[in-house]
Amino acid sequence: MSRTSLTRFLIQEQHAGRINADLRQLIAVVARACTSISIAVSKGALGGVLGDAGTGNVQGEAQKKLDVISNEILLEANAWGGHLAACASEEMDHSQPVPDIYPRGDFLLLFDPLDGSSNIDVNVSVGTIFSVLRCPTNVELPGDDAFLQPGSKQIAAGYCIYGPSTQLVLTVGHGTHAFTLDREKGEFVLTTENMQIPAATQEFAINMSNQRHWEAPMQAYVGDLLAGKEGARGKNFNMRWIASMVADVHRILTRGGIFIYPWDKKDPSKAGKLRLMYEANPMGLLVEQAGGAAWTGRERILDIQPDQLHQRVPVFLGSREEVAEAVRYHHAHDDARG
């Protein structure tokens, strides 16, 4: 029996009334763009795409050549199809409406074109993260404000991980599914349907080098994880950290765990490291659709009403019971302080 292609999967979702034709075509365009990015990434040094681009993004971070290339691939692929009203990228200061020469559709697309790009020169898995919102009604030329919707309003989200194989992980609000790129056929095929994150776990992913900057509930929570079976938790935990959110979250979707990037006082002006609109919201939806949870430590990520396009938040996501435990530490600390 032949495997289900992404095209067939999306058509079936349309026939079931879960997506419309425009959303189906938009996701297909994003998938094709990800295929192009996968080819560029896989060329590495042979394609002359490694190293810094000599420019910075709105966050003040140095851009890699592949950041710029991936951003341009996604913008160009989505400009002319008639499905989008505007795009927003982690690599751009402001959103970009579809040019006037092309028809505009009903959707807004947000993306991190190459998450984890600081690892690209050492051949670690990187990926593209994307989120789809509906454009507010009666907005002819959407600007940044049109994108400021809570994550619960997302109608689709996904990421494409460029590793030993290229995989597209997607939700349209009815489960989380993984598709693997068949390079010979040039199409994604369904390889894991309805991914499920185990409710309990003994693995956590965090950058321990920032420990001295954490607030008290984080110090207590991770301290108890490290204490193992002799400590308050009564079981041993393993730590994993790839420093590529796509790779860390993909592992959690595959076998469970909790991914943590907490608030820290290293730069108190920033509420967190990760971007709400480009990283936390799409990953939060994917994880929740796979039976997991996604919180800031104090509130559900998908409930946050954003106030700016490049807003940052702390992130705790993964196995439901472990996320709840981390939240409990934060709430207990806050309650004790009154």
UniProtKB/Swiss-Prot annotation:
Substrate binds at D115, G116, S117, S118, N207, K273. Mg(2+) 1 binds at E90, D112, L114. One of its GO terms (biological process) is fructose metabolic process. One of its GO terms (molecular function) is magnesium ion binding. Its EC number is 3.1.3.11. Binds 2 magnesium ions per subunit. It comes from the Bacteria. Signal peptide: none annotated. It is found in: Cytoplasm. CDD domains: FBPase. It is an enzyme of class 3 (hydrolase). Keywords: Carbohydrate metabolism, Cytoplasm, Hydrolase, Magnesium, Metal-binding. The keyword RNA-binding does not apply. It holds the Pfam family FBPase_C. One of its GO terms (cellular component) is cytosol. Mg(2+) 2 binds at D112, D115, E279. Pathway: Carbohydrate biosynthesis; gluconeogenesis. Gene3D superfamilies: 3.40.190.80, Fructose-1,6-Bisphosphatase, subunit A, domain 1 (3.30.540.10). Belongs to the FBPase class 1 family. HAMAP family: FBPase_class1. PANTHER family: FRUCTOSE-1,6-BISPHOSPHATASE-RELATED, SEDOHEPTULOSE-1,7-BISPHOSPHATASE, CHLOROPLASTIC. This is Fructose-1,6-bisphosphatase class 1.
